[in-house]
Curated annotation (Swiss-Prot):
Keyword Transferase among UniProt keywords: yes
InterPro entries: RsmH, SAM-dep_MeTrfase_MraW_recog, SAM-dependent_MTases_sf
EC number: 2.1.1.199
Organism: Opitutus terrae (strain DSM 11246 / JCM 15787 / PB90-1)
Localisation: Cytoplasm
Protein name per Swiss-Prot or TrEMBL: Ribosomal RNA small subunit methyltransferase H
Chain segments annotated as coiled-coil in the UniProt record: none
């Protein structure tokens, strides 16, 4: 395991995937490599293919390659492009959505407002535009979608207006000034009563928009299911409702269940392609919460392909 990296819900993931000798597994969010390493160590001749679009993950992947040789393959790829890969027939597929601890802790990446840095927020700095540029050029509709929908921020109107007014001033260029601008847009009474930093939700929304995180999830889940062998298991870890919602709806659809209360599709027209392994999301146990507070909002869903 990479020093300082604690893979979330590891016990539970291994319990559902149940790695077997010579099994083949796909880790779509390599990150620190903790889940991948645990799979490789779980049984003889296990093989793992891992994806990550962050170039910072490559040295960690190279270290695993030195240890496990051809049993481990790393692909420099966004999981939103999973359908492009020729690989298939996996015994298990894992997603661990959201920003990684490494990305949060690397100040210069601009994911956190706790340290001043260029407001970048890209999971792959080689593609797309940094958050600072996105904020300067995004349409009103794009800003509203990011702050209101992706950030779930009730004061979205004030924040969108503040961002528009700050264009061309340099205030959107760095995390500290951006966080200050967002906080100032929120009424003082709500700022002081909040349990989280007032810029938290807006930063989340901008990050999701810059990286097309929800779009990638919606593309990746059906692609991952298609790559499962019969009897293969799909595990999905999410950290907030925006990530969990498409996973929940996809799982229910694959299991022949209504996707929501508004889903009026007759039961005889539904096709059951999988069995649910989790009736409700699995959350971290008390010992994991004590050892890794960042795991507190994690939820795990699992299904088995028929």
């Amino acid at each position: 395991m990479t020093p300082g990296h604690q893979p979330v819900l590891l016990r539970e993931v291994l319990g559902f995937l149940a790695p077997r000798a010579r099994g083949r597994y796909l880790d779509c969010t390599f990150g620190g490599g903790g889940h991948t390493r645990a799979l490789l160590e779980a049984a003889a001749e296990v093989r793992v293919v891992a994806l990550d679009r962050d170039p910072a993950a490559q040295p960690r992947a190279a270290a695993l390659r030195e240890t496990f040789g051809e049993r481990f393959e790393f692909i420099d790829r966004d999981f939103g492009r999973l359908a492009e890969l020729p690989h298939e027939g996996f015994d298990g597929v894992l997603f661990d959505f959201g920003v990684s601890s490494f990305q949060l802790d690397e100040t210069e990446r601009g994911f956190s407002f706790r340290h001043d840095a260029p407001a970048d927020m890209r999971m792959d700095p080689r593609s797309g535009v940094p958050a600072s540029q996105w904020l300067e050029t995004a349409t009103e509709e794009m800003l509203v979608r990011a702050i209101r929908d992706f950030g779930e921020e009730q004061h979205w109107r004030r924040i969108v207006r503040a961002i528009r007014d700050a264009r061309g001033t340099g205030a959107l260029a760095r995390t500290a000034s951006l966080a200050e601008l967002i906080a100032a847009a929120i009424p003082a009474c709500d700022r002081h009563a909040a349990k989280i930093h007032p810029a938290t939700r807006a930063f989340q929304g901008v990050r999701i928009a810059v990286n097309d995180e929800i779009g990638a999830i919606e593309r990746a889940l059906p692609a991952a299911f298609a790559k499962l062998a019969p009897g293969g298991v799909l595990c999905v870890i999410s950290f907030h409702s925006l990530e969990d919602r498409p996973a929940k709806q996809f799982f229910r659809r694959m299991c022949g269940q209504p996707e929501s209360a508004a889903d009026a599709t007759p039961q005889d027209l539904r096709v059951k392609l999988a069995d649910p392994l989790t009736r409700r999301p699995v959350t971290p146990a008390d010992d994991e919460l004590a050892a890794n507070p960042r795991s507190r909002s994690a939820k795990l869903r699992a299904l088995r392909r028929l």
